[in-house]
């Protein structure tokens, strides 16, 4: 049975549109054909033909609708770009990028020298004076500068200093005492048999 021979029913709103019968109508007609054993082949063919016609008509309607609305190209999907194909050449990876090791050199922004990438960070620290050794030298320089400044302030008679600057440095006396005790022992730390 073709789509043209299928019985149709009117739409629910009475708009006059003809739609194919529902599945209940097909099943009811199939049950009538099964009642007689000699009509089993006809019933199976009817059911198969009805399902096939319904599927084909559905695909045709959907394709027609997509073509009229301009969305038929979306049904095909996105074509594969040639830029994303795998490359199978020697010394290249699958994306076509060379796998050979290149010497990576960086230009120092401070001195404009070419430096190997592995040595760039240590070079930049030394070049800009921000490395560990440079910071130690800078902190020593600041300490000596502060010491000279505070000695200069004390010698000029400036009384505007803080209480900490006016205090006596007790740590230097402790160092002297230790050195005096070591000289009493003649440089040895042994008790030499003396008891206290």
Swiss-Prot record:
Single Gene Ontology BP annotation: positive regulation of DNA-templated transcription
Phosphoserine PTM sites in chain numbering: 172
InterPro entries according to UniProt: SAGA_su_Sgf11 (IPR013246), SGF11 (IPR051078)
Observed phenotype of the null mutant: Defects in the number and migration of glial cells located within the lamina plexus of the developing eye; the lack of glial cells causing mistargeting of the R1-R6 axons in the optic lobe. Lamina neuron development is normal.
First-listed, main subcellular location of the protein, grouped into a coarse class: nucleus
Region Disordered, annotated ranges: 1-22, 141-196
Species name: Drosophila melanogaster
Keywords in alphabetical order: Activator, Chromatin regulator, Cytoplasm, Metal-binding, mRNA transport, Nucleus, Phosphoprotein, Protein transport, Transcription, Transcription regulation, Translocation, Transport, Zinc, Zinc-finger
Subunit structure, interactors included: Component of some SAGA transcription coactivator-HAT complexes, at least composed of Ada2b, not/nonstop, Pcaf/Gcn5, Sgf11 and Spt3. Within the SAGA complex, Sgf11, e(y)2, and not/nonstop form an additional subcomplex of SAGA called the DUB module (deubiquitination module). Interacts directly with not/nonstop. Interacts with the AMEX complex component xmas-2. Interacts with Cbp80; important for promoter recruitment of Sgf11 that is not associated with the DUB module.
HAMAP family: Sgf11 (MF_03047)
Record's protein name: SAGA-associated factor 11 homolog
Signal peptide annotation: none
GO function terms (MF aspect): transcription coactivator activity; zinc ion binding
Keyword Membrane: no
CC per GO annotation: cytoplasm; DUBm complex; nuclear pore; nucleoplasm; nucleus; SAGA complex
Pfam families the UniProt entry points to: Sgf11
Localization annotation: Nucleus, Nucleoplasm; Cytoplasm
Superkingdom classification of source: Eukaryota
Biased composition (Low complexity): 180-196
Family: Belongs to the SGF11 family.
Domain note: The long N-terminal helix forms part of the 'assembly lobe' of the SAGA deubiquitination module. The C-terminal SGF11-type zinc-finger domain together with the C-terminal catalytic domain of not/nonstop forms the 'catalytic lobe' of the SAGA deubiquitination module.
Purpose: Component of the transcription regulatory histone acetylation (HAT) complex SAGA, a multiprotein complex that activates transcription by remodeling chromatin and mediating histone acetylation and deubiquitination. Within the SAGA complex, participates in a subcomplex that specifically deubiquitinates histone H2B. The SAGA complex is recruited to specific gene promoters by activators, where it is required for transcription. Required for nuclear receptor-mediated transactivation. Binds independently on SAGA to promoters in an RNA-dependent manner.
Tagged with keyword Electron transport: no
């Amino acid at each position: 049975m073709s789509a043209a021979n299928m019985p149709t029913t009117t739409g629910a709103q009475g708009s006059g549109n003809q739609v194919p019968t529902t599945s209940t109508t097909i099943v009811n007609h199939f049950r009538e054909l099964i009642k007689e054993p000699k009509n089993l082949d006809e019933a199976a063919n009817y059911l198969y033909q009805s399902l096939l016609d319904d599927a084909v008509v559905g695909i045709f309607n959907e394709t027609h609708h997509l073509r009229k609305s301009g969305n038929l190209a979306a049904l095909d999907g996105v074509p594969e770009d040639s830029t994303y194909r795998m490359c199978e050449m020697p010394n290249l990876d699958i994306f076509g990028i060379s796998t050979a090791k290149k010497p990576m050199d960086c230009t120092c922004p401070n001195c404009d020298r070419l430096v190997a990438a592995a040595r760039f960070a240590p070079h930049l620290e030394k070049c800009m004076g921000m490395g560990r050794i440079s910071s130690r030298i800078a902190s020593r320089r600041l300490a000596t500068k502060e010491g000279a400044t505070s000695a200069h302030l004390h010698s000029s008679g400036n009384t505007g200093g803080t209480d900490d600057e006016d205090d006596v440095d007790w740590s230097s006396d402790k160092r002297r005492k230790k050195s005096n005790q070591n000289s009493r022992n003649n440089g040895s730390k042994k008790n030499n048999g003396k008891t206290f």
